[in-house]
């Protein structure tokens, strides 16, 4: 949302926002976009599996007019919005037959970022991998190197030409994927079978490095951004950007500390009490608890990758699941516990599918908003503190007929309570 709002208040002529995300995040992104009440067009491209930035940029270049100017912006960076937008506008006249990049003036010899070498004519001389400490210090001394911010600007036809020249297999696969992908309601769901065959490679390696080292007719320019910037790529950098108390602790939620220093502690579901610790990341959510040293939080991916190896019963299942009509939170119970309790929210004007279940009954208690429940051939308007019982195999549907969220508590009872025990008869989102 902050990334979109950055450009909403600028004078840049925005034609459309294109958001590329994983399929799991589709409904979160939709909810966040709709809550902004945008007047601009938007499109969501859902990847079934991550393939790094090159395929994502390739797909984005193919879905709009070849003469459209595209600006690629990471959503986890912090900028001085006014300075960034001013720089983008000033540099946009270089887009003809060129790829524009933006670099950050280094403030110290960082080894965790890539670097871009440039000259006083803003010509890009090369992209450099994440250096060791000695090399990073040399870059600082030379003064012609900038941190790679991951921002790119180009006409779509120029980027497609780059893929034709340097990564033709990616271009071919992305074209085939788009031809076989579902496209409805501003959402493109990329074909999994085809997209997973695409090479997993960054735009830097696939396109930018050969573009700046081989002779060709496409120019590359780099413009220096010298305002506030941070790449929120870890809990450590998130902590650096958040408000801190006198002990350099960031505390979010119900937190009690004593003699603790330099910690990021967040809890959404329970009191967290810490005593005599420092330099820790503690994140307590409904579905998982993370405790990590700040110096090792870059390795969280390694920890996640070990979960199936350590215990096949450990599954990454989010306690809060998003749907096109709203969300639900699993409060208690599982598929085989005999009962399951959920808290469910429905957006204004939205409704669940007309459905039935073969192996469970349900009890709904309204706790917020104005709801209309269909139960077989009955339609019942309901308010907070009212209850309805839904027998096994009964047709039922929940609809929000008000202007605020409807929230209700659902108690399921049966011998099997999996999400696949559902028969849909009508659905506003094409899931029948």
Task: List the predicted regions and their residue ranges.
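Conserved core of the sugar-phosphate nucleotidyltransferase
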Residues: 81-194
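Catalytic metal- and UDP-sugar-binding loop of GT-A-like glycosyltransferases, i.e.
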Residues: 73, 366, 411
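Residue-level signal for inorganic ion chemistry
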Residues: 60, 76, 116, 155, ...
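Left-handed beta-helix
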Residues: 161-388, 396, 401, 415-417, ...
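Noncatalytic nucleic-acid binding interfaces
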Residues: 408
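A short helix-to-beta-strand connector/capping loop
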Residues: 38-43, 123, 216-218
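Conserved N-terminal catalytic core of the sugar/cofactor nucleotidyltransferase
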Residues: 1-72, 78-80
